[in-house]
């Protein structure tokens, strides 16, 4: 008993010296950390570190959905499509501007239509698979919106290629570049659940309208580049034809963009409690709408009656679309920053 009492005295003296030197807290912290590490090692050895708790709210995926997801993961839809579309667009462009344009032959136009339709159907199949697996429309992040925009581009090209042969070339090129950006960019192709605020049909409608307007504005931009090339080759008839097409496409593109912004404001009021917050994405979308709206004022701004100035203006205006979609997502941030995830 005497030795035990003497030991207690020494312990008290030791702790008093540590307390006076300010090292007691550090020692206690080190002892606590060591104890935690020993406990973690023991739990790892016993297999009791992680004990999953069953979530009654999570439903098991059906066998069909599992098979569909396995199939979707085995087929690199974006990679296949952007390679085929870019190659097809370049070849068709060379055929269009060759000394003997092959688009004059009906058989070549039919082959082009079949290739365009095949690419569109393959893309549609991929989007249907993704929709079936996720249980929602694939328009919730940057990767999915780029996929949807490429699909819209192909649909527009299919509808217009029989009247304007260049639309097939532009459809392949524009959709190919869109899918290329989606594939090599820092976008997340994984199928993930939506956060509650994004689970809204208004959001899907808002995104689909905005992407549709961007697709039309992309066609207008390529029309402008082609018109300048034809102007340098002194082919006035082709310039006038492309100018007419751009003016026709500008009306639905601007109207759809305005509707998309309006529906986005309605959704924002439901989700965030306000229609307009001057978020960077909102500001740049409004700038895009106003700049493209200037091109309608041919009576008050007479310089827009000149085809070449009209096309140059629309080519320059497309930079606002790029800034709205890419610049804001990756550089400015804001409430729409989830779009690049």
Place the predicted regions along the sequence by residue.
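C-terminal structured "cap/appendage" subdomains that terminate the fold
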Residues: 280-326
């Amino acid at each position: 008993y005497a030795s035990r009492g003497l030991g207690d005295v020494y312990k008290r003296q030791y702790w008093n010296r540590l307390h006076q030197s300010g090292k007691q807290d550090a020692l206690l912290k080190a002892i606590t950390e060591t104890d935690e590490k020993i406990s973690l090692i023991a739990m790892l050895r016993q297999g009791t570190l992680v004990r999953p708790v069953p979530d009654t709210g999570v439903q098991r995926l059906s066998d069909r959905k599992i098979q569909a997801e396995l199939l979707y993961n085995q087929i690199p839809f974006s990679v296949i499509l952007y390679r085929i579309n870019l190659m097809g667009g370049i070849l068709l462009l060379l055929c269009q501007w060759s000394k003997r344009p092959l688009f004059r032959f009906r058989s070549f136009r039919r082959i082009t239509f079949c290739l365009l339709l095949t690419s569109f159907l393959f893309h549609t199949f991929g989007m249907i698979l993704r929709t079936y697996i996720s249980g929602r429309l694939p328009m919730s992040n940057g990767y999915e919106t780029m996929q949807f925009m490429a699909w819209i581009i192909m649909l527009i090209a299919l509808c217009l290629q029989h009247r304007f042969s260049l639309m097939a070339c532009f459809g392949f090129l524009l959709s190919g570049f869109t899918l290329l950006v989606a594939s090599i960019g820092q976008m997340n192709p994984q199928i993930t659940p939506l956060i509650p605020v994004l689970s809204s049909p208004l959001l899907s409608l808002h995104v689909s309208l905005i992407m549709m307007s961007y697709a039309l504005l992309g066609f207008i931009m390529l029309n402008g580049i082609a018109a300048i090339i034809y102007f340098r080759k002194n082919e006035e008839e082709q310039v006038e034809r492309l100018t007419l097409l751009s003016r026709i496409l500008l009306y639905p593109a601007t109207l759809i963009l305005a509707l998309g912004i309006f529906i986005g404001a309605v959704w924002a009021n439901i989700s965030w409690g306000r229609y307009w917050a001057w978020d960077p994405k909102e500001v740049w979308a409004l700038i895009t709408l106003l700049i493209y709206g200037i091109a309608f004022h041919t009576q008050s701004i007479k310089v827009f009656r000149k085809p070449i100035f009209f096309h140059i203006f629309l080519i320059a205006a497309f930079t606002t679309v790029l800034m709205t979609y890419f610049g804001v997502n990756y550089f400015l941030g804001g409430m729409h920053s989830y779009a690049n995830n």
